[in-house]
Amino acid sequence: MQHTLTPEEVGAKIVEWYSCIISASYEQAILLKEEARHAVMHMQTNDKILAYYSLVEFRHNIFVDEFNKKHELGDTFEFVETEVDRYLKYLYYFISGQYEYTQERYRSAIKMFRKAERLLEHVNDDAEESEFYLYIGLVYYRLNQYLLASSYLEQAETIFNRLSYYERALNCKQVLGAIRSELHEFETGDAILKEAFRESTFPRTSALILRTLGLSKLRQKEYEAAKTYFYQALEYEEHRSHQIGMKTRYDLSNTLFKLGQDDEALELFQQAKAEANQYNNKEYKARCLYLDGLYIAKDHALVDQAINDLYELSLLYEVCELAEEMVELADQRNDDSTSLKYYRIAYKAKVNQNKLGADQV
């Protein structure tokens, strides 16, 4: 049975093909055209990637024709950039950034998106522009650059609303609410999220908002409320049967462990752990390792490995969150040395997450 490819996987293949056209690698371009064509045939439906494929195919045909003419005359072929190429170059960086984002390589993604941003003037479509603002906002959010993330997401939300793309606008609002919660502005964050939920008529987005409200309540240590929101999110098939459902099962398991409901928590944990491995989700594989060390194996070496794995993924907010929880648990036991150890980890993560390094611009 043929595996269905994601748009991001196919986009990455088309990017590789276009790179060969730019570098005038004739034989490699011919080969990759066939690989890209085969990939498109087995892709989940995505109009943007199909349009990108068509544009690159158009540019490929011009390239091949010009290359052959030059070859016949014994001349050297030189790639001459056109207006189409400037738009294709934008798509090259944008789709590369999307792919890096799906692979959880957020610093690489932001490099691609910043290059795409310099070519936005060649994009004459409001919908495409708003999609760019959404994605770059999401990556800055994952890198804990909340001011930049909010700025881009607010721009995207405004354009989406103007275009009547209401679900996309609500996606922006949901992340803006999450940002306020992560900044411990809980009243404002929860109000934004509840307003978004009232406005939503889209099952997938409604479930995502409920999950975000659950995470906010978890931060506030309102565990019963968090539990309710997570269960409500999992009532939606669109949420339950996808990768995001795995994340919610993990968070629900974490909440239930905190409530002392260990049997139910363990069952959900085992399911979430298996799914995290199935999806190869690096963040949640690390998070599952953390829960295992904290509640099941009761082994701080696993906790330390989990925190280190998150640090290597540049998920500094998550490092800070878990380290601060370890500080709190150590303080409850009057274990000053352990408390100091995790306080230092949390402090280092907090300092670093507020820095915008050279590799992020």
What are these regions (language model features)?
Residues 146, 150-216:
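Loop-centered beta-sheet repeat module
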Residues 56-151:
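Long, mid-chain structured domain cores
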Residues 1-96, 269, 299, 305-361:
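Flexible inter-repeat linkers and adjacent short helices
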Residues 34-41, 74-82, 114-125, 154-165, ...:
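Amphipathic alpha-helical segments of tetratricopeptide repeats
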Residues 13-23, 54-65, 90-104, 131-142, ...:
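Tandem amphipathic alpha-helical repeat scaffolds
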Residues 5-9, 45-50, 84-91, 124-131, ...:
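Alpha-solenoid helical repeat architecture
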Residues 21-37, 63-76, 104-115, 145-155, ...:
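Helix-turn-helix repeat elements of alpha-solenoid scaffolds
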Residues 252, 257-322:
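Structured C-terminal portions of repeat-based eukaryotic scaffold domains
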